[in-house]
UniProtKB/Swiss-Prot annotation:
Span list, region Enoyl-CoA hydratase: 1-190
Assembly: Heterotetramer of two alpha chains (FadJ) and two beta chains (FadI).
3-hydroxyacyl-CoA dehydrogenase: annotated segments: 306-715
NCBIfam families referenced in this protein's UniProt entry, alphabetically: FadJ, PRK11154.1
Name by which UniProt lists this protein: Fatty acid oxidation complex subunit alpha
Record's keyword annotation contains Lyase: yes
Gene name, Swiss-Prot/TrEMBL: fadJ
Length: 715
C-alpha cells in the first residue's frame, strides 16, 4: 500500500484547500520520514495555485489527529547524526507550512500529540473539538526525548514560557478547554462543525501573533527568564534525581531559543534530539513503549474470546468499587455489584460517583457522560440480575472457603458459560477452583490498588483453565483500560513475588540500624516513584505484608522477613496511611505537612536509626533481591517472556522505566556482573543473595534475557 496516500489534497469550490490525513491500514495517524516528500509536494501545489485562499489540515481518523511521530523511525537511526537529521527534516517541513502566505489552520479532533502538535503549532491557527477524545501535548520526554520538529521553539512563543515548560518537561496533555485557556487553540467547537469552523478561520486574514499575558512577558525577559529557569531547573532535578537527561536538555534548548533567537534554538533542538535518541535512558523508555504496545495486541491465547456483554462483581469494597468503575467508565459495559448488604453496594456506587463527578468538575467529561457511566452500574444483595453475566469478578476477603463458596454460587445462579475471575493476590487459583463443576471457567484476575490508577492486571490461569477463558478475560482487561500479562498459578504470581524480597530487604536494613527516610530516599534516587517503606504505608502495612507468609511457605527461608518486625508494627495498630499510623506521621485529614518519619517505630523494632550504609548500598541490596527473584520467575515460566516481566515490574511496582524493567536492566549490566554482585552480597549478608542457577548459567554462556539486537546500544 502506498504511503503517499496518507495525505490527500482537495481544493473546495470556495478555494479553501483541505489536506486530509489518513495513514492507510493503521488505526492511528503517525508521522513517518517517507511522508516528507508527499507533504512537500502538496505544499508546492498550494503555493503554485494562486487561487487558494487558505489551507486546512484535518484527520480522517475517528479518534486522532496525529498521535505523534513513528517511534520505529527513531529506532532505525544508527547514530546521533542520523537522528539529528530526522529532526532537521521535520523542522524544515514545519517551516514550509508556517511560511505559507495564506492562512493555515489545524482542525483537530482526537489525540494531537508529539509531532502532531508540532504540525499544529506550525499552522497559523488551531481549532479543536470539545470532545473527551481530544487531547493536545508533547509527550516526548516520556520516551527520553524532546520535541524535535520545532516544538521547543514554537510552543513558548505561543503560550508563554512557563506553560510551555510545564507541558514539555512533564508531557502533560491538555484537554480542549485547557488548551483554549492557555492560548494553544483559538476555538473549541462541537465535532459536527469542526471543518466549518476551520473554513471560517481560513477565510479570514492571517491573525497577528497572540498577545501574551503580562506575567508571561515578564518571564520571557532576561531577568524573569533567569529566575524561572533557575527555579524550574532545581525543581526538575529534585524530581528526576538526574535519572532523565532529557529534562536538562529541554531546559537548555528552550533557553537557547529565547536568549539567542529561534535559529539557534532550532539548531540546539535538532542536536539535542539526536544525542538524546542514543542515550540508554531513551532506548529503555522506548523499549517499554514498544513492549506495552505489543502486550496490548497480545490476545492471551490463540482461541477466540467468548462474549462480553455484561459483567458481575462480587464485593462492594475498595477493590470491587474500583473494578466496577473501570468496567463501566472505560469498558462501557453494564456491571452489577453483589454485596451481602446495601452498605457495600452504596459504597461502590459512591466510589464511582466521586471519581466521575471529579472528572466533570475538572471538565474532563460532561455531566451527561458521567450519568451514562453511572447508569451502567447497579447493585443487589442476592444474585438477581446475574443470570446472563459473561464474567463475574470476585473481590471478597482473602479466605479460601469463602472464595470457593463464591464459585459454587456463580455456577448455581449464572449462565453455563459464565467465567469466574478471582481478584486474589495470594491464594492459588487451582485451590479456588478445586470444587468447581466447571474449573475450566475459573481464572485469576489480579488488579492492583487503586484500581482506577494502576495500569497492570495479572491474568492467572490454573492448569485446567481453558484457552477461551484466558482470551475472554484478557479482552475484558483491555476493555477496562488495563495492560494484562498472563502469569502462572504459583505463589505470589509475578509482581508480588518479586516485590516481597525487595520489601523484606528494606525491613532488614531498618533492623540493622538504617533510617526509614534513608532507605526510602535511596530507592527513590535509584528511580522508584516511592521508597519501599513508604510504599508499605501507602498500600497498607497489613495488606502489603500478608503475602510474605504464603511465599515463605512455598519457597523457603529466602522469603523469611526479619524476625518480629512486621508483627511488632501491626500489633501496635499501624496499618499505614489508611489509619493514620505507620512508619510515617500523618497530619489530620485536610491538612498538608511535610513527610516525616514517626521516630517511635525504631523502638518497636529494636532499631537504632543510626545506620552507616550509603544510598547506593541500600538500593543495591533491595534491587538485587528483586532481580534474582525475577530471574527465577523467568526460569520457572511464571511469566511468558522477558517482555511481560519488564512490563509487569514497571507498570505494577514502578520499577524505574528509564532502566527498561528488571530484565533489560540485567541485560545492560550483563549476567556476569549481576552474578558477581549477588555473590559479593551473599558473602557479606547471607545466603538469600545466592544467585539463582539461571543467572549463573547465563553468566557462564554470556546469554541475555532479550534478543541481543533488542538491547544493544545503537551506535
Amino acid at each position: 500500500m502506498e504511503t503517499t496516500s496518507a495525505f490527500t489534497l482537495n481544493v473546495r469550490l470556495d478555494n479553501i484547500a483541505v489536506v486530509t490525513i489518513d495513514v492507510p491500514g493503521e488505526k492511528m495517524n503517525t508521522l513517518k520520514a517517507e511522508f516528507g516528500v508527499q507533504v512537500r509536494s502538496i505544499l508546492k501545489q498550494v503555493r503554485d495555485n494562486k487561487n487558494i485562499r487558505g489551507l486546512i489540515f484535518i484527520s480522517a481518523k475517528s479518534d486522532n489527529f496525529i498521535a505523534g511521530a513513528d517511534i520505529n523511525m527513531i529506532a532505525r537511526a544508527k547514530s546521533a547524526q542520523e537522528a539529528e537529521e530526522l529532526a532537521r527534516q521535520g523542522q524544515q517541513i514545519m517551516a514550509e507550512i508556517h511560511g505559507l502566505s495564506i492562512p493555515v489552520i489545524a482542525a483537530i479532533h482526537g489525540a494531537c500529540l508529539g509531532g502532531g502538535l508540532e504540525l499544529a503549532l506550525a499552522c497559523h491557527s488551531r481549532v479543536c473539538t470539545d470532545d473527551a477524545k481530544t487531547v493536545l501535548g508533547l509527550p516526548e520526554v516520556q520516551l527520553g526525548l524532546l520535541p524535535g520538529s520545532g516544538g521547543t521553539q514554537r510552543l513558548p512563543r505561543l503560550v508563554g514560557v512557563s506553560t510551555a515548560l510545564e507541558m514539555i518537561l512533564t508531557g502533560k496533555q491538555l484537554r480542549p478547554r485547557q488548551a483554549l485557556k492557555v492560548g494553544l487553540v483559538d476555538e473549541v467547537v462541537p465535532h459536527s462543525i469542526l471543518l466549518t469552523a476551520a473554513v471560517e478561520l481560513a477565510q479570514k486574514e492571517r491573525q497577528a501573533s497572540r498577545h501574551l499575558p503580562v506575567r508571561e512577558r515578564i518571564l520571557a525577559g532576561p531577568l524573569g527568564r533567569a529566575l524561572l529557569f533557575n527555579r524550574v531547573g532545581k525543581k526538575t532535578e529534585q524530581k528526576t534525581k538526574g535519572n532523565y537527561p532529557a529534562t536538562k536538555r529541554i531546559l537548555d534548548v528552550i533557553e537557547t531559543g529565547l536568549s539567542q533567537g529561534s535559529s539557534s534554538g532550532y539548531a540546539a533542538e535538532a542536536k539535542a534530539f539526536g544525542e538524546l535518541a542514543m542515550t540508554p535512558q531513551s532506548q529503555a523508555l522506548r523499549s517499554i513503549f514498544f513492549a506495552s504496545t505489543e502486550v496490548k495486541k497480545d490476545p492471551g491465547s490463540e482461541v477466540a474470546p467468548g462474549p462480553l456483554n455484561a459483567i458481575g462483581v462480587l464485593g462492594g469494597g475498595l477493590m470491587g468499587g474500583g473494578i466496577s468503575f473501570v468496567t463501566a467508565s472505560k469498558g462501557k459495559l453494564p456491571v452489577r455489584i453483589k454485596d451481602i448488604n446495601a452498605k457495600g453496594i452504596n459504597h461502590a456506587l459512591q466510589y464511582s460517583w466521586q471519581l466521575l463527578d471529579q472528572k466533570v468538575k475538572r471538565r474532563h467529561i460532561k455531566a451527561s457522560e458521567r450519568d451514562r457511566a453511572l447508569a451502567l452500574i447497579s447493585g443487589t444483595i442476592d444474585f438477581s440480575g446475574f443470570k446472563h453475566r459473561d464474567v463475574v469478578i470476585e473481590a471478597v476477603f482473602e479466605d479460601l472457603q469463602l472464595k470457593q463458596q463464591m464459585v459454587a454460587d456463580v455456577e448455581q445462579y449464572c449462565a453455563p458459560h459464565t467465567i469466574f475471575a478471582s481478584n486474589t493476590s495470594s491464594l492459588p487459583i487451582g485451590d479456588i477452583a478445586a470444587n468447581a463443576a466447571r474449573p475450566e471457567q475459573v481464572i485469576g484476575l489480579h488488579f492492583f490498588s487503586p484500581v482506577e490508577k494502576m495500569p497492570l492486571v495479572e491474568v492467572i490461569p490454573h492448569e485446567s483453565t481453558s484457552a477461551q477463558t484466558v482470551a475472554t478475560v484478557v479482552k475484558l482487561a483491555k476493555r477496562q483500560g488495563k495492560t494484562p500479562i498472563v502469569v502462572a498459578d504459583k505463589a505470589g504470581f509475578y509482581v508480588n513475588r518479586i516485590l516481597a524480597p525487595y520489601i523484606n530487604e528494606a525491613m532488614r536494613l531498618l533492623t540493622e540500624g538504617e533510617k526509614v527516610e534513608n532507605v526510602d530516599d535511596a530507592l527513590v534516587k535509584f528511580g522508584f516513584p516511592v521508597g519501599p517503606i513508604q510504599l508499605l504505608d501507602e498500600v497498607g502495612i497489613d495488606t502489603g505484608t500478608k503475602i510474605i507468609p504464603v511465599l515463605e511457605a512455598a519457597y523457603g527461608e529466602r522469603f523469611s522477613p526479619p524476625a518480629n518486625v512486621v508483627s511488632a508494627i501491626l500489633n501496635d495498630d499501624r496499618k499505614g496511611r489508611k489509619n493514620g499510623r505507620g512508619f510515617y506521621l500523618y497530619a489530620a485529614k485536610g491538612r498538608k505537612s511535610k513527610k516525616q518519619v514517626d521516630p517511635s517505630v525504631y523502638g518497636l523494632i529494636n532499631a537504632s536509626g543510626q545506620g552507616k550504609l550509603t544510598a547506593q548500598q541500600c538500593a543495591e541490596r533491595c534491587v538485587m533481591m528483586m532481580l534474582n527473584e525475577a530471574a527465577r520467575c523467568f526460569d520457572e515460566k511464571v511469566i511468558k517472556n522477558a517482555r511481560d516481566g519488564d512490563i509487569g515490574a514497571v507498570f505494577g511496582i514502578g520499577f524505574p522505566p528509564f532502566l527498561g524493567g528488571p530484565f533489560r536492566y540485567m541485560d545492560s549490566l550483563g549476567a556476569g556482573e549481576v552474578v558477581a554482585t549477588l555473590q559479593r552480597l551473599a558473602s557479606l549478608y547471607g545466603s538469600r543473595f545466592t544467585p539463582c542457577e539461571t543467572l549463573k548459567q547465563m553468566a557462564e554462556n554470556d546469554l541475555r534475557f532479550w534478543p541481543a539486537q533488542e538491547t544493544d546500544p545503537i551506535n
